[in-house]
């Protein structure tokens, strides 16, 4: 129980004791005896009663002639007054009883007391505790001392450049003479920018664990709350505390909550958040000296930060913490696998190859899911099977094996996924097929997984055209074999449209329109940007853009239709294999293409194979025709858009 709550309880107990004491005191009767009504009438008839006072609740307060006072209670008796008069008793009628003064005072004070207590309670909750009700202008930053943070730079992997930048900051704080002797100045601020989950906050924790100096940590959203002026006051208080503890480090997580561009959006530019930002700008690089204070901030939206915040003198360094490459992913997996028992068949390098685009948080979640799966199966070690399943679960969602799928839907899904896989397998510029399944997972009824053979920072025009053709493979397979199309290709068609439009309007891959970017990026008001931009091209150009997009998709559709028609047996074989086995891997896809079955036939005596050797071509398919079709498609996907 907090100090504030204890005080409130104490005050309430004191008030209750006071009320009880007064009530007990006022209820005492001083030298008054109780007299029954019969006894009272007898006393009256014996002429021993001097006077009575009758109250409005039938109560009787009387006085005997010997001076004794008494109380009695009279039932409804119409002859009572006459009896009293006949016996010479002085009669007085008492007015209605008024409550005691203290009762009136207490009745008026209780609502006020309740309101005051409620106000104090709300203020205490608003400020998150701390024992002081009116401390909302104070900084809520947490001071991390030595030993409080167990994370070090050894726990950070996959972001070597960012780690090196921050290691230099820590080294300056530990040995400033090394830098000052040659005239170097430590950066006043370091901005960590990158996608979510790449390790920005982890790097800050590593700095806190390694620095050996006071480390203040606060979130950008902690500056601004419900009162005007609180944000600026908290910024001042934060830097005041930092100056007292210099040299030190201030870490502001999610700085975009307070550092967004000023003067943008609706409603003008004078609001509480902007005043907080102005105060932050002054504290970081104003007239006052902040020697020995280094500010580190993290955000995944550097594009919406105010330019004044990013200039040298405030955040001198902007460190990009991007998604890790192959080597980085392997290093991250090794860090997260330290406390997990892995079986001998687990190869972290293979896992790293199969997880392009994964962030550090994704990889940590992957190994954790693998550990949970192994525990669910009562295993003592984590095998490669659990890691593979966890990888797909993180990417696509959990399997839905209990989901009831009709035979018609299973057949449609099998041909749909076979269409994707066959086009990807036959086109040279498409990513190789890794796995095909018709088991529902997440929101998908089935999926075809393709993995690049190497890390890719860019995509060529040929690869983009191949991606369009692979995406169309599912819809075209449905139309060719089932003579029907379904809504299952909605996501594929969206991907096709987006890629084709980007090729024409963003990447300048159209010979008709040339290397020009059409249309400015639309920024949303809540991101701190302008409300929008006008289209920067004419209606004639808009018509040409639509025509080019349509032409790209139409050509791809025709090419894929021809490819799948020429390899119809391959399509049937793969669909049947999926219906039977539900999941096939890359080796099975290759065997289906060569032998018409998922398993490689037993080795026979070697023989010289001609260009159109029927032993490696599916039965019923013209080898020359198949070879020429693939070659034609390869050439088509490489040609420039005309």
Swiss-Prot record:
* Active-site residues (renumbered): 417
| Sorted UniProt keywords | ATP-binding, Cell membrane, Hydrolase, Membrane, Metal-binding, Metalloprotease, Nucleotide-binding, Protease, Transmembrane, Transmembrane helix, Zinc
In terms of Pfam families, this protein maps to:
AAA (PF00004), AAA_lid_3 (PF17862), FtsH_ext (PF06480), Peptidase_M41 (PF01434)
Question: How is the co-factor bound, per the entry?
Answer: Binds 1 zinc ion per subunit.
Q: Note the superkingdom of the native organism.
A: Bacteria
Q: Where in the cell is it found?
A: Cell membrane
List the cofactors: Zn(2+)
Q: Which GO terms describe its cellular component?
A: plasma membrane
**Residues that bind Zn(2+), according to the entry?**
416, 420, 492
Question: What is the recorded function of this protein according to its Swiss-Prot or TrEMBL entry?
Answer: Acts as a processive, ATP-dependent zinc metallopeptidase for both cytoplasmic and membrane proteins. Plays a role in the quality control of integral membrane proteins.
Oligomeric state and interaction partners are given as: Homohexamer.
Q: What is this protein called?
A: ATP-dependent zinc metalloprotease FtsH
Q: Which organism is it from?
A: Veillonella parvula (strain ATCC 10790 / DSM 2008 / CCUG 5123 / JCM 12972 / NCTC 11810 / Te3) (Veillonella alcalescens)
């Amino acid at each position: 129980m907090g100090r504030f709550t204890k005080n409130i309880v104490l005050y309430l107990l004191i008030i209750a004791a006071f009320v009880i004491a007064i009530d007990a005191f006022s209820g005492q009767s001083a030298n008054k005896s109780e007299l029954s009504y019969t006894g009272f009438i007898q006393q009256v008839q014996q002429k021993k009663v001097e006077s009575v006072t009758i109250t409005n609740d039938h109560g009787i307060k009387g006085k005997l002639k010997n001076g004794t006072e008494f109380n009695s209670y009279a039932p409804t008796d119409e002859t009572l007054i006459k009896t009293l008069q006949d016996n010479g008793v002085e009669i007085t009628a008492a007015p209605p009883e008024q409550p005691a003064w203290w009762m009136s005072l207490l009745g008026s004070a209780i609502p006020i007391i309740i309101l005051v207590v409620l106000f104090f309670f709300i203020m205490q909750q608003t400020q998150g505790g701390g024992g002081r009700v009116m401390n909302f202008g104070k900084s809520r930053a947490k001071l991390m001392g030595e030993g409080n943070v167990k994370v070090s730079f050894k726990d950070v992997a996959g972001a070597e450049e960012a780690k090196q930048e921050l290691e230099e900051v820590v080294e300056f704080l530990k040995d400033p003479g090394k830098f000052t002797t040659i005239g170097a100045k430590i950066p006043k601020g370091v901005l960590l920018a990158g996608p979510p989950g790449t390790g920005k906050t982890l790097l800050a924790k590593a700095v806190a664990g390694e620095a050996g100096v006071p480390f203040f940590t606060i979130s950008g959203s902690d500056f601004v709350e419900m009162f005007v002026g609180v944000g600026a006051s908290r910024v001042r208080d934060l830097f005041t505390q930092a100056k007292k503890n210099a040299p030190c480090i201030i870490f502001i997580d999610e700085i975009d909550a307070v550092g967004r561009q000023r003067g943008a959006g609706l409603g003008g530019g004078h609001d509480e958040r902007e005043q907080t930002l102005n105060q932050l700008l002054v504290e970081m690089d104003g007239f006052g000296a902040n020697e020995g204070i280094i500010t580190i901030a993290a955000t995944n939206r550097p594009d919406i930060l105010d330019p004044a915040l990013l200039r040298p003198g405030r955040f001198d360094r902007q460190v990009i913490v991007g998604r890790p490459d192959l080597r980085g992913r392997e290093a991250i997996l090794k860090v997260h696998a330290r406390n997990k028992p892995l079986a001998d068949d687990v190869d972290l390098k293979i896992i790293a190859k199969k997880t392009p685009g994964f962030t550090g948080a994704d990889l940590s979640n992957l190994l954790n899911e693998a550990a949970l799966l192994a525990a669910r199966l009562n295993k003592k070690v984590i095998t490669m099977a659990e890691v593979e399943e966890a990888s797909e679960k993180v990417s696509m969602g959990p399997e839905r094996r209990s989901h009831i799928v009709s035979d018609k839907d299973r057949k449609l899904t099998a041909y749909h996924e076979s269409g994707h896989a066959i086009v990807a397998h036959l086109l040279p510029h498409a990513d190789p097929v890794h796995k095909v399944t018709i088991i529902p997972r997440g929101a998908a009824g089935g999926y075809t997984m393709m993995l690049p053979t190497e890390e890719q920072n860019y995509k060529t025009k040929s690869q983009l055209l191949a991606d369009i053709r692979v995406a169309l493979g599912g819809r075209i397979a449905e139309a060719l074999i089932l003579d029907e199309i379904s809504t299952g290709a909605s996501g594929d068609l969206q991907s096709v449209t987006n890629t084709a439009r980007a090729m024409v309007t963003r990447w300048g891959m159209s010979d008709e329109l040339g290397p020009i970017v059409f249309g400015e990026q639309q920024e949303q008001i809540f991101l701190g940007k302008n409300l929008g931009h006008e289209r920067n091209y004419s209606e004639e150009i808009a018509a040409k853009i639509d025509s080019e997009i349509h032409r790209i998709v139409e050509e791809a559709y025709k090419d894929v239709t021809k490819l799948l028609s020429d390899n119809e047996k391959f399509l049937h074989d793969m669909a049947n294999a999926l219906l039977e086995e539900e999941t096939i891997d890359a080796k099975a896809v290759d065997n289906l293409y060569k032998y018409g079955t998922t398993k490689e036939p037993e080795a026979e005596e070697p023989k010289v194979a001609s260009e159109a050797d029927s032993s490696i071509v599916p039965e019923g398919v013209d080898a020359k025709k198949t070879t020429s079709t693939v070659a034609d498609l390869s050439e088509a996907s490489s040609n420039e858009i005309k």
